[in-house]
Amino acid sequence: MSTGFFGDIQKVRYEGPESDNLLAFRHYNADEIVLGKRMQDHLRFAVAYWHSFAWEGGDPFGGRTFDRPWFSNEIDAAKLKADVAFEFFSLLGAPYYCFHDADVRPEGRNFAENTRYLNEIVDIFEKKQAETGMKLLWGTANLFSNRRYMAGAATNPDPDVFAFAAATVKTCIDATKRLGGENYVLWGGREGYETLLNTDLSRELDHMGRFLSLVVEYKHKIGFKGTILIEPKPQEPTKHQYDYDVATVYGFLKRYGLENEVKVNIEQGHAILAGHSFEHELALARTLGIFGSIDMNRNDYQSGWDTDQFPNNVPEKALAYYQVLLAGGFTTGGTNFDAKLRRQSLDPQDLLIGHIGGMDCCARGLKAAARMLEDGALSKPLDERYAGWNGEFGKRLLSGLSLDQIAGEVEAKDINPQPKSGRQEYLENIVNRYV
């Protein structure tokens, strides 16, 4: 049954690259076979409940710009929001969605009321998933918006806040499991510090390690089969966040013995804030064996902060999905659009148009990445660049020779290496041919 919010807009269909219909896919064809698998199953698109239905269009200099009938802290408004959200999911045709607890329920007076509200909405989600075929990619707890978390959740100096946050995560894992969620995400927006003058760094890291260990322990206790994911971000809202980037998260996981239990959910915008490319973070996660899922968006190239815009740069997406394919593709993860409308984009159809453009951009990137992989366009030059290490001397350097033996061979054989071109321009031109 239609809520009327989207008017007479019909379900979005694939019409091909020649279509000029703004409410149709030009490149995302869910059933198209890419590398032996349906495009839908490669990309595993998800809609973010928070940006799509909870964000009000405000910024640091101005308040709400969006006029949505569900903007109130009442359970009936939350139910209307759920109706509109699932209508949107059905119109768009993305197979998954993601949510924080605070996105979907009103803020209660205490933990018990929050839990009751959440369970009431989960009852509704269960029915709607059965009716629509929608699936939950991941759930998470909002441990950063409420003022109780101003000094962190897992890293808060007050043990009562730690306990409240842990109890909240428990209820959110329960909800995620009940809805068949395939992952559970932890993002530490307030896990960090504004100044070291009032921060016990060692204690806070240990507390965060304890918190994550509790999550993993509970996952196994209740038989939740999904993947636990950490989402790295270097700053914003906190000046310095402990889950700075993939490398930092990996070091943290190793320190607390959790590297085989937890993977990463990598967001493009967060990678940029950390001084990396999206491609870099994906490649490193793949190399370290902790790649899990992605939050797809982009930052404004000029502003220098996390703007969460819909992706529109196909070469960037081609290189990103190239790394995803090298990792073997998604298992429990997927492509969640952690992207929001601009605050002047007021019309309901803008929400569809933003997602359609993002899905088309990702589809083009995936197809380009698949062709590069099939043709060996990047792997062949890479193999040539490192070919010397496959020879007898290269193998001995890595496994048999001591430092003094290496020095002896360099002198005896008069080894005098000359640099070879890295061919960066050639490789960049190859990528552009495929996109």
UniProtKB/Swiss-Prot annotation:
Keywords: Carbohydrate metabolism, Cytoplasm, Isomerase, Magnesium, Metal-binding, Xylose metabolism. It is an enzyme of class 5 (isomerase). The keyword DNA damage does not apply. GO terms for biological process: D-xylose metabolic process. Its EC number is 5.3.1.5. Mg(2+) 2 binds at residues 267, 270, 306, 308. The keyword Transmembrane does not apply. It catalyses: alpha-D-xylose = alpha-D-xylulofuranose. The active site is at residues 100, 103. Signal peptide: none annotated. Binds 2 magnesium ions per subunit. Mg(2+) 1 binds at residues 231, 267, 295, 338. One of its GO terms (molecular function) is xylose isomerase activity. Homotetramer. NCBIfam families: PRK05474.1, xylose_isom_A. Belongs to the xylose isomerase family. This is Xylose isomerase. It comes from Brucella suis (strain ATCC 23445 / NCTC 10510).
